[in-house]
Structures are given as structure tokens and as C-alpha cells.
Amino acid sequence: MLLQIQDGTLSIGAQTVLAHFDFEIRGNEKIAIVGRNGCGKTTLLRLLAGELSLDRDDHSKAQGILTSRSLTTGLLCQQAFSDTTITVEEELLKSCPCPDKWDRERFTWEQEYDRLFTGFGFSKEEKRKRLSQFSGGEQTKIALIRLLLAHPDILLLDEPTNHLDVETTEWLEEYLRQYAGAVVMVSHDRFFLDRTADTVCEF
């Protein structure tokens, strides 16, 4: 068990969005969250990312979110970049774990960077373009690249195939199937979920 929620309830203001629910991630599961619109799927992702908290109930036996160890999570955000005047390379280098460009770890990171960048349909020359020169859909792709480069223990994806063409979607499917960590995803693309998820959780 990597993460577990037992009898959790989450409210936003006076509205209860998720009531008395259970949720669990085992190992490197690839989990599809499905359900009607407005049932709280995106809210669950925000909870797992630490942006929201479960309601406190002193009478409940539930202990909130239990984890087997300290975990890192990564959520694909809609408003991805605070400064769009810098280049793609400048933005992505912020998350590079090794500032020394001659370090072996830096070399490995840059190889992964190149693989992801071209995998999402960009040319290497576009790394030098400013973020403001890319469309909203392209910026979403770049935000996803930044997230994947961080290799979080739990990857949280909300409609990751939006703005992706068929070829790029298929590339992402293969990447996620081989991803070493857990993935929790929300998508209206059932074909994408069928090809990437090994567990379905209905809300």
C-alpha cells in the first residue's frame, strides 16, 4: 500500500464534494478515475496533491491520508507558468536536479528532456523560444514535460490528452505504461484510459 484514504469526506465551503469515500494506491498502479461530471474527480486529484484537505471529524475512526513513506506528487496545473517571457529551456532548467552541466546526472536528465520534448512533437530548436510564443495547448504540453521530468512518486493527470494529436497521445500512453511511479488520471478519453490504466476507480 502506497497511499490509503478510509472514510474520507471533503467539503469546499458549505458543499460536501466527496463524502465517506475510500481510496487506495498500491505500488506503481495506473489508476483511472471515472464518474459523471461534477462528482469530484478533479477535487480528488487536488486532495492527493496536497492542495486540499479532508474534513476533520473528531468522532470518525478514519485517520485521514495514510502513506507507507514520504511521497512526492505532481499535478498537471491549468495555469502552468507564472512567467511566460522566459524560454522553454530556462523554465525547464529550474527543475534540473544538478546545476553542473558536466555532471553525469545532468547528462542523463538532458537525455530524458530531449526524449520528452521531441516525443511531444517539438523540435529541439524550439527550446529557445519564449513560452509566450506557444499556444495554450502547446504550453500545456510543456507543463506536462516539466512534470514528467520531476519523476514524482504519484503522477496526477487531469485530462492529459487535451490538445494532443493521435501520434502524441499514443506516445504518452506508452510512456505512462512504463512509468516507474504510480499514476492517477482523469480523462474523458476512454480509449486512452483503456490502454494505460490497470485499475479503474468509479466515483
Regions found by a protein language model. Give the residues of each.
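ABC ATP-binding cassette signature C-motif
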Residues: M1-F203
